Amino acid sequence: MSGGKYVDSEGHLYTAPIREQGNIYKPNNRDMAEEMHEKQVYDAHTKEIDLVNRDPKHLNDDVVKIDFEDVIAEPEGTHSFDGIWKASFTTFTVTKYWFYRLLSALFGIPMALIWGIYFAILSFLHIWAVVPCIKSFLIEIQCISRVYSIYVHTFCDPLFEAIGKIFSSIRINMQKEI
């Protein structure tokens, strides 16, 4: 066992010795070892998607649920022929349905790519720029706040206390003369 390499009882070679409680590569605790092998890892990138309910968080409930009745309506007394009304309904519904599918087929993946890149950049900037800047600012402002606190307690507190004592002795009496 030279050169900092260690071999365990099963013949595995390690660069670090196995301690009594084990290490991250080979725990001595059998329960812990079994738990590590039995854990199921769930990855957010490989989760199953629901092809039936595609808006589980109801993001677009009030925005894009536009039906024929929401757009075109004939008031009482001004009705077109029933056949025209049915054909208009069918034309509107089918056109909206298939044109949405066509646009989704043409632009869905590129838009998903663009929005994925955008939110990746946004997340990156938030994690690596915004939060550290805010933390840095809070650390730096602590020094200024201590100096400001000393200034207020040294100069402003006595001044305003004296002004308060001056004005506390003023009495106002109001009388109504008839």
Curated annotation (Swiss-Prot):
Pfam families: Caveolin
Source species, domain of life: Eukaryota
Localization in the cell: Golgi apparatus membrane; Cell membrane; Membrane, Caveola; Membrane raft
Start and end residues of each stretch annotated as Interacts with SPRY1, SPRY2, and SPRY4: 149-160
Lipid moiety-binding region (S-palmitoyl cysteine): 133, 143, 156
Oligomeric and partner information: Homooligomer. Interacts with GLIPR2. Interacts with NOSTRIN. Interacts with SNAP25 and STX1A. Interacts (via the N-terminus) with DPP4; the interaction is direct. Interacts with CTNNB1, CDH1 and JUP. Interacts with PACSIN2; this interaction induces membrane tubulation. Interacts with SLC7A9. Interacts with BMX and BTK. Interacts with TGFBR1. Interacts with CAVIN3 (via leucine-zipper domain) in a cholesterol-sensitive manner. Interacts with CAVIN1. Interacts with EHD2 in a cholesterol-dependent manner.
Stated name of the protein: Caveolin-1
